[in-house]
């Protein structure tokens, strides 16, 4: 029987993993129903990889709890202090991502921060990053400086801090191994930062379960700073054990920013194509995987038939 592995995204430290899994499965069930599928995966059918507390503790320099399987408002006056505490490498990463998101939002060209990350150091780099974050707050719908700070902190730590990457990767590797009792295939659904983790693990794995579907809604893999960090470690590839890769995106989701087209995420000649459908995410900010609405229905990527439909096909 094909199993389901779910990998969450950014900024979920301190949350109850069982409640998060229930939300994901609730939204996915709604999406499957909308797609005409009779399937309703339950906790018994899925492994939810929760690394939120592990990532938070590793980033803060403490002893991490284990990876388990089962947006804040920013005071503009606090931005210089928050940004100034970041190391130069993370500052450059933050500035690169902020500028690319601002370009994607088509902000006014006369208010572009006057410097670029390359070669900028010290106070000038802090000032440029603070200016870019202020512009994000002003011009980018659905994204705040606080959200972007958290996203870049988490993604940068995963991409550039070996101890963070090893710990989080190990949790997903264990989930992939534990999801099957033999050679059963595994469907992987990975949202936001979780898609970076899933890609990194699957692209680097040798023997392991077949993955009939890798689903990466709202992925930041197409953001240049993220893609280039991955490509600096190993060439970009279509993971060998993945049969189908679907990467849905709402064009208003500026934390995902780009469709995973060959121009944005180039793969070797002859590689299978990544399917990149455009969808409409009704969740606030257009980025959430699962979002409960007041009327008891679901929003978020997983609640959409175009997103959940491929999961139903792969699980049958």
Give the location of each predicted region:
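Lipid deacylating catalytic domains
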Residues: 1-52, 56-61, 118-189, 193-316
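N-terminal accessory alpha/beta regions
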Residues: 43-110
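Proteins enriched for Cys/Gly/acidic motifs involved in redox and nucleic-acid/cofactor modification
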Residues: 98-129
């Amino acid at each position: 029987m094909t199993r389901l592995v779910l990998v969450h995204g950014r900024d979920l430290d301190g949350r109850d993993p069982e409640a998060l899994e229930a939300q994901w499965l609730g939204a996915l069930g709604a999406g499957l129903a909308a797609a005409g599928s009779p399937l309703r995966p339950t906790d018994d059918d899925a492994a939810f990889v929760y690394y939120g507390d592990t990532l938070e503790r590793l980033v803060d320099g403490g002893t991490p709890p284990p990876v388990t399987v089962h947006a804040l408002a920013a005071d503009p006056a606090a931005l210089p202090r928050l940004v100034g505490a970041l190391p130069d490498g993370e500052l450059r990463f933050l500035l690169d991502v902020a500028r690319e998101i601002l370009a994607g939002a088509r902000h006014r060209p006369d208010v572009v921060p006057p410097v670029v990350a390359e070669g900028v150091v010290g106070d000038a780099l802090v000032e440029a990053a603070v200016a870019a974050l202020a512009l994000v707050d002003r011009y980018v719908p659905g994204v705040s400086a606080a959200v972007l700070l958290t996203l870049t902190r988490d993604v940068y730590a995963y991409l550039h801090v070996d101890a963070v990457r090893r710990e989080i990767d190990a949790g997903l590797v264990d989930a992939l191994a534990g999801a099957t009792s033999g050679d059963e295939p595994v469907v992987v659904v990975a949202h936001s930062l979780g898609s970076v983790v899933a890609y990194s693990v699957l692209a680097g794995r040798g023997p392991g379960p077949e993955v009939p579907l890798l689903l990466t809604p709202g992925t930041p893999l197409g953001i240049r700073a993220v893609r280039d960090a991955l490509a600096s470690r190993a060439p970009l590839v279509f993971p060998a054990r993945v049969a189908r890769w679907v990467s849905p995106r709402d064009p208003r989701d500026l934390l995902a920013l780009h469709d995973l087209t060959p121009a944005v995420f180039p793969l070797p000649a002859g590689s299978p194509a990544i399917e990149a459908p455009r969808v409409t995410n009704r969740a606030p900010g257009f980025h959430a995987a699962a979002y409960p609405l007041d009327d008891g229905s679901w929003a978020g990527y997983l609640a959409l038939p175009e997103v959940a439909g491929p999961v139903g096909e792969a699980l049958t």
